[in-house]
Amino acid sequence: MTAGNITTLSVLLILLLAAPSFGHAQTLPAAEKQKIETLITRVGDLKDAKFVRNGSTYEPSTAVWFLRGKWNFNSSDVKSARDFIDKVASMSGTSGQPYLIRFNDGKEIHSRNFLLAELKKIEP
């Protein structure tokens, strides 16, 4: 594979992940979509924390971009906010490692636990 092919594939992957998903609107109830958007926003609002994925540490804003892209890519599998947590935002599909949120004090929590707690706050 040439460098040009790799660059083209990289650009296509970025476009795929960044593209808005028409599937969200068709298969996901509006209330569930709003819950997912709120959960993603809550991750982005973590000012004193980092998102840990496959051993690498990321700023919350990068985690937001990543979670939206992964949700977009897996939109046909996500029928609820709980599905989003379980199928998209909890662990790496490649390595099987759980995603973590690492706070400035060194404490870590699985993203699944954080998101489930946040979901409880927004559900009636």
What kind of region is each of these model predictions?
Residues K50, N54-P124:
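Compact alpha-helical subdomains of small soluble proteins
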Residues S21-F22, P29-A31, V78-A81:
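A short linear-motif detector with a strong N-terminal bias
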Residues M1-S10:
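Bacterial N-terminal signal peptides that target proteins for export
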Residues S10-P20:
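Bacterial N-terminal signal peptides
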Residues L17, V43-D45, G93:
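A generic structural signal for short, solvent-exposed coil/turn residues
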Residues N5-I6, F22-Q26:
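Terminal, compositionally biased segments
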Residues A25-F66:
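N-terminal secretory signal peptides
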